[in-house]
Amino acid sequence: MNEGLAEKEKWFSRSDNNLALYMGNHVGFLGAICELTDVPGILKWDCLKTDWHAQPAYPTSMIYNPHATNQAVSLSLNAPSDIYDSVSGQFIAKAQQTTYQLTLESDQVVVLVAVPAGAGLQKQGSHLTANGIVIDFNSNTPLDTL
């Protein structure tokens, strides 16, 4: 038993390698990227918050419904937006103003991109862009069906 205490003292007594200082810092990251919604148990995750080397991007959020029933979640928008779901590869709403009412089926996850309303869409290989900014890196949907 003393052997374990000696090992513990070896690792945690010096401030230059005190791992205890760093063991909980990941909780701060989770708090920074997570936001409550108006439905208990459904969280909105900011997919761009910790991407420090990101290319230009539109607001992107992941939302998952863990409930056994369909749920309606209200989402606030910063500007008029077309809502693109990169999981389904489709726009699920067009020309939304300040709030969008999202209906999620049970166990459904969406990754939503708030694209400026009426943005010009282009395909560049598998990339789908809106006004030159990538909104889907692996789009299989033909441009004329969006």
Where are these regions (language model features)?
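Residue-level "contact hotspot" at macromolecular interaction interfaces
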Residues: 101-103
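Catalytic domains of carbohydrate-active enzymes that cleave complex glycans
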Residues: 1-90, 96, 105-112, 116-145
